[in-house]
Structure formats: structure tokens, C-alpha cells
Amino acid sequence: QEQAIKKESAWPERPGFLPFTRQKNLGKTMTYEVKSLNEECGIFGIWGHSQAAQVTYFGLHSLQHRGQEGAGILSNDHGKLKRHRDLGLVAEVFKNPADLDNLTGEAAIGHVRYATSGGASINNVQPFFFSFYDMQMGLAHNGNLTNAHSLRRELEKKGSIFASSSDTEILMHLIRHSEQENFLDKLKESLRRVQGGFAYLIMREDKLYAALDPNGF
């Protein structure tokens, strides 16, 4: 019976689940260009479940030890993206059942945030939500970009306006500045620009993308 319970609760064997948490890279050193944010966050994604937001809520509970500063969930209901986020623990952010019930749809991404600096501001709580004339996008990120400072400076010179002090936004701005024809190629090109350890979840109206750094962060 004990073995059956363990097998039933093994997340990797359940299709549709994309749990990512940060793993420490022991025995290796890295020269950091900037240490403005040292995030130890947790991200969770699911696609094709009738109660995607509810499952993500429990997924974030299991990742609560990864971050206690803030939490949020973004859902996808037939191409319509909706989000709820706030400062505090998962149970505090979603203490009103209506906030979770309003996140309808069969896909969702979630994030619990921890940061040693950068300010306890709701602007830094993920998932981030971007709405443009031609697309909507949700973004959740765990990691530390070692070239964040230079990329941010480059993007600001091109006219990008950042709404948070987190380096998470950098990927979105790189995607928007890319001259590749389709979104997947834009994403691939942008991921080649960022350096460091990272895990991303990117929600589009019709797809959910997951990206991991080349070193297996």
C-alpha cells in the first residue's frame, strides 16, 4: 500500500504537469555580473486539466518552502488569460475562494517568490502578464540571470520600459525586439541571449512553453 501511494503521488508520471524548482549547483563557481536579485522561487505549470488553477494552487503549496514573499496564478480559458497575485503566502493570497474560482480554464502557471533584495512590491510578484496588440503572454521565472544588468541597459536604450525591478521581464522584452517571424523562433533567439541559471514557463493563448538553462538548472 505504501508503494502504491508513493507511485500515485509521483508528479513526473502524471501527464500535463511541469513542476520546476531551483537546484543548487554545488562544486561550481560562476562570475556574476550583478547580484541584484538572488531568487529561490518555485514555478508550476499544467495544461489540459479542467481544474488547472486549483491544481496549480496545491502545486504552489508544495513549493511554498521555495518562497514566502508572494504568490500568483495565471490561467488560460480558451485563449483568455486571467491572473491573481499578491504579497504573502499561498493561503493568504487566495484566502478568498472567489479569487481562485475566477481563474477558469484548462491551463495555468503559478509562482511563489523569494528574493533577498529588490523590494517587497507586488510589481515583482509573478506570474507576469503582458497584453499587446497582437498577443497576450504570461511569464513565470525561477533563477538568476548573470547578464541581467547589461541586457536591461541595452533594452532600455531601445525604448523598453520595465514595470518591475526583477530580471524576469528581460525575456519578454527580448522576445518583442526579436525580428524572427514566429513566436517560437523569437523565444529561442531570446533564450540564447540570457545567461545564468533559469527555468521559465511562458503561457500563450494556445500554448505553454517550458525552458531550462543549458546546464540543467
Language-model region placement:
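Conserved short alpha-helical segments that host acidic/polar catalytic motifs at enzyme active sites
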Residues: 27-217
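Low-complexity, intrinsically disordered or signal/transmembrane-proximal segments
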Residues: 1-3, 23
